Amino acid sequence: NVIVKNRSQVFGYYDHNMMVMFERTGDHLKEKPKYTPRQRLWYIRAKEVLLSTGSIERPIVFGNNDTPGVFLSAAAKEYIKVYGVLVGKKPLIFTNNDSAYETALEFKKQGVEPIILDTREEQSSELIDAAKNQNIQIKFSHAVVAANGYKKVKSAQIAHISSDKRNLGKIEKINCDCICVSGFWTPTIHLSSQSGNKTKFDEKIDAFVPGKSKQNETTVGSASGIFNLEETISTSFEKGYQLSKKITNNDNKVSVPQVSEKKFTNHDKFWCVPLPDKKNFKRFLDFQNDVTVSDIELALREGYRSIEHVKRYTTLGMATDQGKTSNLNGLQLVSDVENKVVPSVGHTTFRPPYTPVSIGAIVGREIGKHSKPTRKSPMHSWHEKNNAVFV
């Protein structure tokens, strides 16, 4: 009694637990039957909704970070594990947390020697120790100052960074052909927020998480700010069981699978590398709309204080990705300049669609009960009689 929809994306969460989803039905087929649509739109009204939307890795901001060859660390790992593709043969891993060490270990498995720059002071964890045991070079308290290269990354300028993250040491050059960046993880709360859920800021993970639900909606996993696999599975199974029991009166519990994972240590609350003296590198926050750190600083100097005003002045988060990797870094910048905490700065509004959807899928041809009568002007019949051209 379970329907699984592959190649599908819920892009809007509306009142009365109505969700709108588009299904990609034809684009992936080499030979598709006649009249097969490219996409199909679904209107779903649910008694209960369980959101397991995950989280998105966020970058660390540094100079020339829009140079081709700069990747999110998780993306580089996925290229290796899912597609068998190496994004580079001289990778530089730049991180403030343990998850990027998994990427470094994947490179090592493929016979590639990565170098890790960790903004944290030297410490130990299961993943850090695993990297050391593989003889992976690790530079603690170091940061990428800027990427070098015109059409692709050819090297990087790196430096020791002070414990307060405000001062850089002597800059040195290190050869690399890609830079894999990890600035920790941001819960994907867009659908939860669209449902009317009031978000709250979690100081532990430096990100917003769902607060009290307004509709019959429950968020689980990393979308709720839980990044431990064992806890994610146990809480998700429990909440799923409670919802199933509520809807079906079925009291059959499902055994929770046992998992083993390497434990992560705390991440570094660091998101942007300071500019060195007499340097003016472009440091991009929003890659789609080319919004830089200096753009945000200018908006604040011009007197814009509300984050919604800063957003509109700079177009931060207004591209088709709606700031999925940039919004939180933008909020951190505003809070730093204004000497405020992030919750007092607020956050921008999440609006549907979560991902772009074609107008053709929304308009449709076979719309059934969602048909709406065509409204015509009082002059319509006269226009028809006089052979008007309708556009």
Where are these regions (language model features)?
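N- or domain-start disorder-to-order transition segments that initiate the globular core
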Residues: S371-V391
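Residues forming the flavin
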Residues: N1-T374, P378
